[in-house]
Amino acid sequence: MGLEKLLYLRGVGADFTDCFGQYICIPEADRQGILTCMLQEKNTQACEAKDEPLTSLPSGDELDAQVYQLDAHHWTQVLPAFHWCYVDEPWVCLYLPQSYRGDLLLTFTCEQGERVILEVPFSALKPIGDYRIQAEELAQFGTSPFANECQFLQYRLDLLGHEFYCRDAGDTVKQDSNAEQHNLSEPRRSWENVSAAPNGSNNKDYLSDLSCLGLGYHTLSVSLLGLADEQQGVSTASPSAASIFAASKTTEFHGTFMVAPRTAYQGGMSAVAQGKRHKPWGVSLQLYSLRSESQWGIGDFGDLEQLIGLVAEYGADFIQLNPLHALDIAAPEHPSPYSPCDRRRLNPLYIHLPSVPEFEPLKTEFAAKEWQETIALLNAENWLDYPKVSELKYRAFAHLYTVFCEHHLQPNTPRAQRFEDFVAEQGAPLREFAQAESLRSPRAIAQDEGFYLYLQFVAEDQLQLCQLKAKEAGMGIGLIRDLAVGAALQGVEVQANSQQFCLNASIGAPPDPFAPQGQNWGLTPLDPVKLKQHQYRHFIELTRANMTHCGALRIDHVMGLLRLWWWPLDKRLGHGAYVYYPVETLLAILCLESQRARCVVIGEDLGLVPPDIIHRLYQAGVYSNELFYFCKDHQGFKPPSQYKFQSLMMLANHDVPTLVAWWTGSDLHLRRQLDLLNTDEQLGEALAGRELEKHQLAQCLISQGLLAETDIQQIDIEDLLTAWMPFGASGNSALYSVQWCDLLGDRHAVNIPGTWLEYPNWQRRLPISLSEAAGRPTLAERLQRIAAARHLPETAAHTDTL
């Protein structure tokens, strides 16, 4: 029972339901292998390579001690280290010995520094749970401030509906200078509405209304007055208050108190839900794939600004981007934006060089033949050569940084001051990133830490400008950023925060008929227990960083808020298991950060989605992410009127074929060439199934009057695309997007899941430049028809479905 309880307390799942609805029991050996990954301090992969034995799982007293720490210890600490509540239902969780009957003093220190001190009678506490610790366990494993107490009660203190007294802010109790707090630079709302005290209240303020409790991360201190009064010789309601405390006489306890909203930020989406005629739409793209005359071998923020102006003219509300995360500077040949080294930082390759102020003094130098020939060669390629692009741009960055140091840092100009402010605001995490970049960068582009700080400063500046331009152009949302589900083991995000990650496992998906061996994405998972022990600091920091300079954030594999499939790095430890996370707390943090950043949240919920999370996401105002290809029922493609309202409908994305490839079947032939379809018979079956789907789609378009009735083989692909896009746009979904590559009629895949070296994933460039695209009549017609389809009659009402 002890080991099973530890597995439960560490979040290691015992079973799950697969994509066919079948109940799957996870073998005990696999579950214990994941537990070993969590508990093992050594690098298990290195142990496997050296054939070293692994540390055995805990047993006896060691096992009991670990169970005690996770199951019993918090009952002895009065106040959770991290507690949260909803803003409209503020309450405090307390753990007290059963024998304690004294009053309490609660001190709330808000983020701006204001304090509210409440004197709470014991009668206001409502018991909601109890726990008995065995005396021998307490003696052997415990660090309780209470002596000889084994029975504890959990209390709920509702902050609304009670009459508390608010002491003068000067009558503060001693503050613990070591109490951990979240470092938040921007001001937050504090508590208000403290009315005058009733007669006879001894000059105390009467706190009549706590409904204005501000959103944020506050600090809460609790003092037990029963003991404090007895120490001063005052009679208390608890006859033996002092006797229940240990010799340390600890009477004050501290924790973080988060107040969260019920839902994520909705922005203009609330008006859409109420029947607003215009429903937002936009385009999605891989930023690196854009072409222009001013880029240096890769799509950049300058190209993004140009695209914003282009699509905004047609009424687009957003541009959805691939993850912009920093990648491994030492391995530019691995360009997947979903395998970053640090999700809190931007990829400097997206910097548009001519827009950097330091570029102007260097124009003559960069106009030299050596530079221009290299730029022209890279711009002419259809596939990105990341090592060459990286070498070229980092050489140019070095020149820019030299100018910055000479023209700004040394004379301490206003631009230099903005740089210093940026570095100070970002704090230690940014400096750690710069240090890691300096150490890992190839010798040819190696620079000091200041260089990498400068690149992040410039990249953040340009991304912010793009969002400002989008809003100025009339876009309702602007940019939609993308947050990858994890980060690479050797990256600075994991290594600098290793105490919150499990370094011996990686994220993926369990085996299924489509991937019989399962999927291993090579990304390091956060450890749910360690994350909680560190008061969710990394998750807060990560979410906040990715909600800057955008109007919405798409969270890749949003099911990870509830559970993730872990693979052990050491293959001797089995075949993996699901690990569960504190989903309610993570969602509350997500909603709080969303409201603060005024950022809509979209959860990528494609694939195996557990029912447990669907309703939670819906209630939290997180938008689902649907794909046209998968939006089907037993009769074929669903009619647009049946699309989920609270969703982003995408015709296609980076993991599925482009519209042209799907219609022509070229994606299936490519899969056969790559041995993803093992036989010609499998290819034939896939092509036959695709033919049936094509007939279903054609009938949908014909029935809506978008396509003339004709033999399917006679349908012109350009006409098909022009009909298909507004068909999806006419649907019930609150948000709708089309890939930029589909608008241009490109057939090439961005990424083919299940391949690595077999196909050049994340390297395909678009066939034409932005200026060429702007002159295409077919593009203009498609954008106009999509925009028209997103404007509905006043009487039209959406159907809200999960």
Each language-model region and where it sits:
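Long, contiguous interaction/targeting segments characteristic
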Residues: 1-44, 48-71
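Alpha-amylase-like alpha-glycosidases and glucanotransferases acting on alpha-linked glucans and related
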Residues: 142-144, 330-460, 486-737, 741-742, ...
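Ser/Thr/Pro-rich low-complexity tandem-repeat tracts
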Residues: 183-185, 195, 208-211, 233-248
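Structured C-terminal cap/extension of enzyme domains
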Residues: 745-795
